[in-house]
């Protein structure tokens, strides 16, 4: 016997279903549920008088059951915007589908059986995304990691050794000894970490040593001398060991111009940091490189999106980060050459066109580690307001744009750095790094951060209260952030050479090491929803940017969503 209920009543009980729409926080972005895995009438819910009870939604006889199920969640990922249950076992995602007890419920996936051994997170009215990946971290201060977690980022890739002058400017962990110490320090934090060695060397020995010591990639930075010889050698060694190379090119064109760098790269895969150039790179035309098929381009978040305040804040920021002296005219000229309104405006549009593929932070070194997710969605909102619907979207929803932008900080950095077999999306077999958001707080303040299948970070109330919700509600570490659970639910990414040599055992690491792979074969075409390769041109006098002949320009935003109203307390 069927019972028909109003759509609004159904949404109130179980969350939105196929065809329902919702707004993402206070943005102009609207999503529409494309598919619902539920079998209507057999939804699985937990609580007093609810479904997940022994012999009802919980199987009495099954032994091979889930460790954790997230029920009736709205899932946003590069592959779709759907509603369903997420099954997790042994810290890994089983799949998205219909969970429950197949003995009493219709449509239950045999891999998603709920039993007495299953924990539950109620996902009704919640959005779930894959844990974010920040691929441009200066490891200056450990305090960056709680900030990143509090914005939904669970994987950090970069370099450094703490607040050393070199680390404040460059994303490198140089040398075998420094690499070992940072790998050991990684054991203290409930996130996945990977470290880039210093790539600036014209001879191979030091580069090989760093890779064998555990570097998951190499970083070329202009402050160490990103010459054509260093670029060529770094890429040659990376090709040999299958690790990624990230590059910050020569702003002052001292060792060569953009064309010289392109010749040195010679068609080999490379991740270009802050591709627009305000964060560094050949002035004024480094942005042209985003159109190359072998370039994996990213932005850092201070220029995301272009606003009336963007230019004003950058000069002092740059002087501090690159150890420049405001009393030296050449240092001031160096800084001023990098800050160009025209290319920053074009950067907004190149993101919307899917030309620039990733967004990262540049943490404490011209970037804010706790704002990667927020600034990504601010950029998407600004482009919706200024440019209208994307091709494939409609007046009903912005699903295509939402998929494009979420890929910029999830699957695409995972693909670029050879870790997509472990993280970056909500797909079977991947580490269960999941972020739960209330829709009204999407992109700003997550509710729950699940790390490797266990809650590691949470917006939690007073621990002495009678219930979990009383103020002050603060982001606090949960049990997944302590003891042996931390090492069992997070990974340290290293080169295959280091992994195979047993670097974890050599250094007595508590976290499992995971080898990066496929770093040298990935191309721009492999990056999801963000693989356009137009011919980009920059006028050397006006800095005007064109893609396939079309002028790329937009007005700076005077106000943004996901801003002050969310940070009153």
From Swiss-Prot:
Q: Which reaction does it catalyse?
A: urea + 2 H2O + H(+) = hydrogencarbonate + 2 NH4(+)
Q: Name one GO cellular component term.
A: cytoplasm
Pathway, per record: Nitrogen metabolism; urea degradation; CO(2) and NH(3) from urea (urease route): step 1/1
Q: Which sequence positions carry the modification called N6-carboxylysine?
A: 219
Q: Which UniProt keywords apply?
A: Cytoplasm, Hydrolase, Metal-binding, Nickel
One GO molecular function term? urease activity
Q: Which domain of life is it from?
A: Bacteria
- Places the protein is found: Cytoplasm
Q: Where does substrate bind?
A: 221
EC number(s) on file: 3.5.1.5
Tell me the residue numbers annotated for binding Ni(2+) 2: 219, 248, 274
Task: Give binding positions for Ni(2+) 1.
Answer: 136, 138, 219, 362
Q: Name one GO biological process term.
A: urea catabolic process
Q: Which residues form the Urease domain?
A: 131-569
Q: How does it assemble?
A: Heterotrimer of UreA (gamma), UreB (beta) and UreC (alpha) subunits. Three heterotrimers associate to form the active enzyme.
The family line of this record is: Belongs to the metallo-dependent hydrolases superfamily. Urease alpha subunit family.
Q: What is this protein called?
A: Urease subunit alpha
Q: Please tell me the species this chain comes from.
A: Herpetosiphon aurantiacus (strain ATCC 23779 / DSM 785 / 114-95)
The encoding gene is ureC
């Amino acid at each position: 016997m069927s019972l028909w209920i109003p759509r609004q009543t159904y949404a109130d009980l179980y969350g939105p279903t196929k065809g329902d729409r919702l707004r993402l926080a206070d943005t102009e972005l609207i999503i529409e549920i494309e598919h619902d895995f539920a079998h209507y009438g057999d939804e699985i819910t937990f609580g007093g008088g609810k479904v997940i009870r022994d012999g009802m939604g919980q199987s009495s006889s099954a032994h091979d059951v889930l460790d954790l199920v997230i029920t009736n969640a709205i899932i946003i990922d590069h592959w779709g915007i759907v509603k369903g249950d997420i099954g997790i076992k042994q810290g890994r995602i089983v799949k998205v589908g219909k969970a429950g007890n197949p003995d009493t419920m219709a449509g239950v996936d045999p891999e998603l059986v709920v039993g007495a051994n299953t924990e539950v997170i109620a996902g009704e009215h919640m959005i779930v995304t894959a844990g974010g990946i920040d691929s441009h971290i200066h490891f200056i201060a450990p305090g960056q990691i709680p900030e990143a977690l509090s914005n939904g980022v669970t994987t950090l890739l970069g370099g450094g050794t703490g607040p050393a002058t070199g680390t404040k400017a460059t994303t490198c962990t140089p040398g075998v000894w420094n690499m070992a110490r940072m790998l050991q320090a990684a054991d203290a934090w409930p996130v996945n970490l990977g470290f880039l060695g210093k790539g600036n060397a014209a001879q191979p020995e030091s580069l090989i040593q760093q890779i064998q010591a555990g570097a998951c990639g190499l970083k070329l930075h202009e402050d160490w001398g990103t010459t054509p010889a260093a670029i060529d050698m770094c890429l040659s060694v990376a090709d040999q060991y299958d690790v990624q190379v990230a590059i910050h090119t020569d702003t002052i064109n001292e060792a060569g111009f953009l064309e010289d760098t392109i010749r040195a790269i010679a068609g080999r895969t490379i991740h270009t940091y802050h591709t627009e150039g305000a964060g560094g790179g050949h002035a004024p035309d480094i942005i042209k490189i985003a159109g190359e098929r072998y370039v994996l381009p990213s932005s850092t978040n201070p220029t995301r999106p272009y606003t009336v305040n963007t230019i004003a804040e950058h000069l002092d920021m740059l002087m501090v980060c690159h150890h420049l002296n405001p009393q030296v005219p050449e240092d001031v000229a160096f800084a001023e050459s990098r800050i160009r309104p025209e290319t920053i405006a074009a950067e907004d549009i190149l993101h919307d066109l899917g030309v620039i593929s990733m967004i990262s932070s540049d943490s404490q070194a011209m970037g804010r580690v706790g704002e990667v997710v927020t600034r990504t969605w601010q950029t998407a909102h600004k482009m919706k307001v200024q440019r209208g619907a994307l091709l494939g979207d409609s007046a009903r929803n912005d699903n295509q744009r939402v998929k494009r932008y979420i890929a910029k900080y999830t699957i695409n950095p995972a693909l670029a750095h050879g870790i997509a077999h472990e993280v970056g999306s909500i797909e079977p077999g991947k580490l269960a790094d999941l972020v739960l958001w209330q829709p009204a707080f999407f992109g700003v303040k997550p509710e729950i951060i699940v790390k490797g299948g266990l809650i590691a970070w949470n917006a939690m109330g007073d621990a002495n209260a009678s219930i979990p919700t009383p103020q002050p509600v603060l982001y606090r570490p949960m049990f997944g952030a302590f003891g042996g659970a931390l090492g069992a639910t997070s990974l340290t990414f290293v080169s295959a050479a280091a992994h195979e040599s047993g670097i974890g055992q050599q250094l007595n690491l508590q976290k499992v090491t995971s080898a990066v792979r496929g770093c040298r074969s990935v191309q721009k075409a492999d990056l999801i929803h963000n693989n356009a390769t137009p011919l980009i041109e920059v006028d050397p006098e006006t800095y005007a940017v064109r893609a396939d002949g079309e002028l790329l320009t937009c007005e700076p935003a005077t106000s943004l969503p996901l801003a002050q109203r969310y940070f009153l307390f």
